């Protein structure tokens, strides 16, 4: 198959639409179920590159959750502790495969943003992973293969309309890539820089110690940034992105956005949130929305009389700003990657509030000294990678 007609492009009025190969090769995919659209394929192909690189860099199964050509989450298949199983709503599923753990992490980090996601998996989709996907609102999945049991589960989703794409894991694109804007063709070499330990070797702070687990997490952050619209900043902890700040014109706004998402991830683990008693039969999305509001500044939207009764069995106490700050002060060992240099130390100040201890960024700002000095103030270890990772 050298081309595939699509229903429409980005919007319903943008017709005709198709994906195709410029050379004489066949498309490296097979659509096993559903009818993926233009944006689905953009998510799928960006996501597939991300998880393929995560697997190569870490040796672990990887998953990502994409929305509008940007990763809401990305993770490798480390085991889940009981708290994470609870906040990812998988505590009733028994032991999960490494690939299923990777998707539980990728989906669970920012569940609000992952609603209706497109999933990419580095490995053959197994029954555990398919069973997890079955429970979530999602548009589709791309993987190098599917077990018979997994495919049966996924084909039954959305009344048979769930998009399932098999990709040839041996496919490699041409070294030059092209895109058109306003009828004008742009050409560039593909971004094929390997993200490895060597990239993290130039540690410019007084603290030179970056443990192996932090190196793994920094590589996850940088690989995630390779496929995130710029400007972008990514917070990672324990093998998963916990906050992705994407597509902001201001670097510090990226850091604030990603930091707030990371804070929300950690706040969801607080006993005060874990102990919330929801009404029977509440939908997963409504539960996610209620938690997001409860831990935020608009908490009275779910605690006001006439509102809380629809969500909770027992009216929760207010989660005060002081209580939240005290809980967040316990967050440690977080890593941070940035797709370009930090122009001001305000980014470091904000990162510190979310438990960041390890940073990777290109360096090259005229204010590098001020940024390094701020890192030293908090005993952070920061590596200058010397490479920018813009994605447009």
Give the ranges of each region predicted by the language model.
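Glycine- and Gly-Pro-enriched alpha-helical subdomains that act as flexible
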Residues: 72-112, 242-341
């Amino acid at each position: 198959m050298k081309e595939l007609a699509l229903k429409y492009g980005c919007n319903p009025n943008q017709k005709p639409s198709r994906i195709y190969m410029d050379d004489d090769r066949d498309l490296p995919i097979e659509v096993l179920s559903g009818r993926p659209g233009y944006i689905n394929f953009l998510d799928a192909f960006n996501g597939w590159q991300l998880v393929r690189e995560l697997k190569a860099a870490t040796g672990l199964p990887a998953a990502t959750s994409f929305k509008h050509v940007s990763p809401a989450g990305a993770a490798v298949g480390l085991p889940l502790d009981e708290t994470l199983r609870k906040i990812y709503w998988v505590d009733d599923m028994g032991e999960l495969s490494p690939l299923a753990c990777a998707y539980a992490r990728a989906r669970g980090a920012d569940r609000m943003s992952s609603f209706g996601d497109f999933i990419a998996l580095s490995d053959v989709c197994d029954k555990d992973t398919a069973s997890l996907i079955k429970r979530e609102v999602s548009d589709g999945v791309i993987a190098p293969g599917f077990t018979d049991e997994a495919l049966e589960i996924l084909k039954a989703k959305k009344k048979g309309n769930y998009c399932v794409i098999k990709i040839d894991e041996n496919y490699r694109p041409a070294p030059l890539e092209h895109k058109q804007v306003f009828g004008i063709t742009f050409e560039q070499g593909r971004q094929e820089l390997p993200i490895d330990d060597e990239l993290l070797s130039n540690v410019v702070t007084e603290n030179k110690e970056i443990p192996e687990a932090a190196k793994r997490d920094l590589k996850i952050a940088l690989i995630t940034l390779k496929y995130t619209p710029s400007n972008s900043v990514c917070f990672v902890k324990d093998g998963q992105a916990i906050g992705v700040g994407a597509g902001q014109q201001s670097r510090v706004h990226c850091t604030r956005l990603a930091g707030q998402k990371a804070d929300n991830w950690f706040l969801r683990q607080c006993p005060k949130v874990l102990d919330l008693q929801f009404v029977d039969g509440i939908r997963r999305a409504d539960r996610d929305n209620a938690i997001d509001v409860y831990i935020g500044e608009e908490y009275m939207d779910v605690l006001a009389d006439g509102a809380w009764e629809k969500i909770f069995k027992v009216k929760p106490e207010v989660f005060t700003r002081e209580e939240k700050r005290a809980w967040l002060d316990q967050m440690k060992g977080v890593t941070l990657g940035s797709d370009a240099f930090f122009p001001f130390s305000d980014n470091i100040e904000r990162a510190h509030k979310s438990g960041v201890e390890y940073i990777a960024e290109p360096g090259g700002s005229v204010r590098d000294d001020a940024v390094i000095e701020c890192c030293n103030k908090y005993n952070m270890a920061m590596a200058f990678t010397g490479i920018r990772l813009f994605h447009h």
